[in-house]
Amino acid sequence: MAKAVYVAEEVRVPEGVEVSIDGLKVTVKGPKGELTRDFSHARNIVIRLDEDEEGKKVVVEAYFANRRVKALVGTIAAHIENMITGVTKGFRYKLKIVYSHFPVTVKVQGDKVVIENFLGEKAPRIAKIMPGVTVKVQKDDVIVEGIDIEAVGQTAANIEQATKVKDKDRRVFIDGIYIYEKGVAE
């Protein structure tokens, strides 16, 4: 398979966002906070900060890249884009509390979500909240917000997984907490 001589992806840096690059460690500061990510596992890749007439941009590039390195360039550029979106707007996941017979009670206690009376169970089910994420319960909705897309997504997945029904017909036992909307918080 032929190697590409030069592969590059550009990510624009908007006003009010500060990006610093130390080798393969990228730090993004914005109005909502600061995110740092280490890409040192990505060999043969260069991350640098450039400036042109349109403003600042982060360039992720590689020379003589095979298919794996090409994919890695795009992945790292997407991660940096998500970091910039996170510190400017943030991310929000919305989950719906669904129950048919036993009324489910959902409470936030410190760094965990406690789900009580799920399918009439005596013991509460517990889902972990990742660091830097806020969880709010409003009637039948659970709102998960934060600046790190991976932490927000993992927290929402933890809540959804905690209410998984095993050994029963999913068409009959529809109880659970389900993700129904995800996106940018604004």
UniProtKB/Swiss-Prot annotation:
The UniProt keywords, alphabetically, are: Ribonucleoprotein, Ribosomal protein, RNA-binding, rRNA-binding
* Ranges that cross the membrane: none
Which molecular-function annotations from GO does this UniProt entry contain?
rRNA binding; structural constituent of ribosome
| InterPro entries attached to this UniProt entry | Ribosomal_uL6-like, Ribosomal_uL6-like_a/b-dom_sf, Ribosomal_uL6_a/b-dom, Ribosomal_uL6_arc, Ribosomal_uL6_CS2
The Gene Ontology biological process terms listed for this entry are: cytoplasmic translation
Q: Can you list the GO cellular component terms from the UniProt entry? A: cytosolic large ribosomal subunit
Does this entry carry the keyword Nucleus?
no
Q: Which Gene3D superfamilies match?
A: Ribosomal protein L6, alpha-beta domain (3.90.930.12)
| Classification via Pfam families | Ribosomal_L6
Check the record and name the HAMAP family matching this protein: Ribosomal_uL6_A
Q: How does it assemble?
A: Part of the 50S ribosomal subunit.
The entry sums up its family as follows:
Belongs to the universal ribosomal protein uL6 family.
What function does the entry list?
This protein binds to the 23S rRNA, and is important in its secondary structure. It is located near the subunit interface in the base of the L7/L12 stalk, and near the tRNA binding site of the peptidyltransferase center.
Q: What is this protein called?
A: Large ribosomal subunit protein uL6
Q: Which organism is it from?
A: Hyperthermus butylicus (strain DSM 5456 / JCM 9403 / PLM1-5)
